[in-house]
Regions:
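Conserved "HGTGT" condensation-loop signature of ketosynthase/thiolase-family condensing enzymes
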Residues: 1-138
């Protein structure tokens, strides 16, 4: 749906970040076809060709769905990814879905230069949130 698209676009606009500046996304990524295909389509809509340059991970693959706590924990994962310049893996990634065609960092994390990252938290009925984070250079 358009909710995830609008949420990411509004976050980028509010933060004054161009889509091309983003390096990494911690996706809502529940590991279900419906959610993952919709979120992938939304990322393509927001980032265009740049979507293929992003690492898009699901830390839920490691923690499970923490319900009300998921967004906070995933924002921490995203801050740590920026600090450590390391994209965490999407573990248990075994059967690629043709509708999900981004770099999901399957099964093994990797070093990556990152300046800006997003963390998505998308919910049923349009309860969507997204936070933009920047690597601290201090």
């Amino acid at each position: 749906g358009t909710g995830a698209i609008d949420c990411m676009k509004l976050t980028l606009a509010d933060a004054g970040i161009a889509p091309e500046q983003v390096d990494h996304i911690n996706a809502h990524g529940t590991g279900t076809h419906m959610n993952d295909a919709c979120e992938t389509a939304a990322i393509h809509a927001v980032f265009g060709e740049h979507a293929k340059q992003l690492t898009v991970v699901s830390t839920k693959s490691m923690t499970g769905h923490l319900l009300g706590g998921a967004g906070g924990i995933e924002a921490v994962f995203t801050a740590l990814a920026l600090r450590d310049q390391f994209a965490p893996p999407t573990i248990h990634y075994e059967q690629p879905d043709p509708e999900c065609d981004l770099d999901y960092v399957p099964n093994a994390g990797r070093a990556q230069a990152m300046t800006y990252a997003l963390s998505n938290s998308l919910g049923f009925g349009g309860h969507n949130a997204c936070i933009a984070l920047r690597r601290w250079e201090g």
